[in-house]
């Protein structure tokens, strides 16, 4: 069992140990108790462990919100100071180190102090306590031979992390992190990784090009993956073909099933008004579908032609290209955990200089130059005529060039918002994902909200304008930033800066084939033996990819780098945009996506490492981008795109704080409101600082408040 519950040895209460999260906490009772095993079905929500004790009260050593439901699951109230009369209750306490639920029949009262939360019954009674691991880290590591047929057994266990097989697993909190996979001589499965019998089978030929594209399906469907041909998904009495166009049909099955689960789950624990449920043109019996076993439900989902469903589906968030090679097997659990659409490209298209792909003229020796303004310069050190000053004009023509052995690849376009690449080569317009960065995500855990450290390094006087980004970090309520701005660092000072425990490094300066330019000499991270404490970074300098990749290999989670020379003015603009987005809680990949909408030069940048890295949590949880436009006299159109972010993954519910819409939406759906009064829009814009596109240009919500005042 992943959770142990034991009596406290020196006090009245229980100690709870979560072996998945490696956490332990205590809760206290008004008398010594002996926990007795209880059925997990005694609770309204799924739990990993359940015990019954006799007590007159429960206390936890933290301030929490207590949610009370009736015996049938109807939500009655939530808060930290209330009382309810005699009745049968299901009570949830949040936050807690695990999900914590109580079931009992008694009048009770909730109270809090500045350090504790208490639930007191009128008289001692049996209380059944349920615990569910937050499961943000894997339950263990599966060892397996890496040939495709052997690997199928490991992929079949990815769904063991699911907390339920009901449609509620479309909530990210009910999808645990899949177990890790690593090469081994034979299959070894940790005791805590227990298979889930969903009744779903995925049949594919034993080849990487067929196995990799179904890993997200295997996880979300808790499916057994078996060798066979033709490719298909099947359950008792039904079969869904995955050919022709195998990868496309696999992606469609994931999107369709997930969408239907989000609609069907309104029949369960959370009967909310869901916009997508209210507007669907599909005449399905969602209540009946909700009650079906997973395999039967999935069969009925997939019996609906995709062409009928497609117009209602939101744009999916992420596609990951995973080269069909054995060395990439260890990244599969991370890709599946993000519910990414997966492709397995067997061939790679090399990116050539001069193509319309972001490399332009900047690859290799500078024989030609992109046009620059008379007072413009690039962020690499290169020869230049006096009329166009450059940084480090003493350099040879090779300076600023990416190493000759660097292979740039041009992945096929995607229909999703974001794109990641796993395998050899430097992808254009995609996140270069790496295994070490994903492992650091697990080590980092949840983003801490106490203090966020940002280091801005500006190593060139001509770039001081971007150094002012320091003023953009810390523009947040409830989150405290420690911001350090440093100029003109020496090589040794730069080494010390990179080794410091910093949440985000914003580097402004020169990078070339010799490394990062310092005041005395260069620091080449690819050759240096140095410790890196920086968690995330933006290296806003010419062709900084290799230095950024070295940062990730040496300790960082991820960062934004350039593939080409970058002109100073647009680089400054992009740096300021990224600063504000990271400050607002966006992750690296989504921040760069938004920046690319504003600046065409954004395509000269990519993310290396873990694109899901954030430095602080968005106040809204999810990352939100708005679009506004004039609708009619005195009113506005408002569109909101919500992106998954950290623990607020795909399937998260969100709701706009406007009276024009009472409906809930799920990530990654878009909310579109046609006629919002100026006063209402003004109130919404004032809630928090958000990126807003108005007349196809990026603004910030606080900057647009005067617009609504003019109406």
Predicted regions located by residue number:
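Long, charged/polar, low-complexity intrinsically disordered N-terminal extensions
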Residues: 1-122
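Caspase-like cysteine protease fold
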Residues: 522-524, 583-711
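Catalytic cores of nucleophile-dependent amide-cleaving enzymes
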Residues: 503-588
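Structural motif
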Residues: 203-207, 457-461, 486-489, 508-510, ...
